[in-house]
Amino acid sequence: MKLGIVGLPNVGKSTLFNAITQAGAESANYPFCTIDPNVGMVAVPDERLQPLTDLYHAKKTTPAVVEFVDIAGLVRGASKGEGLGNKFLSHIREVDAIVHVVRCFDNENIVHVEGSVDPARDIETINLELILADIEHLERRLERTRKAAKADKKLLVDVDILEKLKAHLEEGKTARTFEGFGEDEDVDRVIGESDLLSAKKVIYAANMDEEGFTGNDTENERLKAVQAIADAEGAMVLPICAKLEEDIAGMDADEKEMFLSELGLHESGLDRLIKVCYDLLGLMSYLTAGEQEVRAWTIAKGTKAPQAAGKIHTDFERGFIRAEVINYKDLIELGSLAAAREKGLVRSEGKEYVMQDGDVVLFRFNV
């Protein structure tokens, strides 16, 4: 899973990225300090891994990972190449979903490119640049499809959808709010094939003031403005304090727990962000366990056993025989796989088995 962190300059993008990856991406107080995207691999928090590691005395523990990309800031006119617009847009095209950092904090030492803090305006600015780029992209596809439809009448369905979609975008609306998207097979296919930037799923990371941050300040007017936009387009909002997260990132586990407790928080904003992104894309993890390694594997919800096996190695999918599956909680409660077998809790599942989150699996295959 690859997530792009986007936002206008000086909204806290690189500060958030620093906290996520502890990679120390430069976070200077001027536009375009992150000219090339910084990439960081981040573990998906999973409290099941350590108990499994202890149970098997595993030599290695490997969590599922999320790839975060810190993408250079953009300004008005990015779709026409202003600032670093062209680079920005091409980098967004490569990600699975967008974490849009929106400035909701005051700091007179950090200059906002528009001269004031207005999250609704900032969201509109970035969405508009994505929409304008999509319109240009769509016009070329529509022209090609119209020509092809003269010989293949089946493509008239695509032409109709593309024309309506173009009109929708020209009203300043994102592709993800287009009627039928996520519900109609033809609409989903056409939008998917069009590779539209404004169709990507979004989490608005509302970057709040450090002072008095609770992670759930529902009365904050700027947060309300972000929430209203998210509600209108079916997006998600996560209040976060990037500066606070950057401070926490340098702490050891005990310090971190104590610090969060003092703030009245159960987990860091980064852990919440990663989990929300995971859920947003409809992903889950299954687990493999043995003396050599305990590992979490990322798959889409609804994945069947052979395709899940293919995540480990293509041979596993090609030569799939069966999956030996046990529920994680049952395995931990009984204390060993042998005890679980005695209780009849290890199931033998075939090619049609739909994997469940937290399945502990041993795949049998032959090639």
Which residues make up each language-model segment?
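C-terminal-of-GTPase-core extension/linker across diverse P-loop GTPases
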Residues: K2-V6, F17, R144-V354, V361, ...
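Amphipathic alpha-helical transducer elements in NTP-driven molecular machines
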Residues: F32, D46-L49, T62-F68, E82-D96, ...
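Conserved G1/Walker A P-loop phosphate-binding module
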Residues: M1-V111, E139-R140, R144
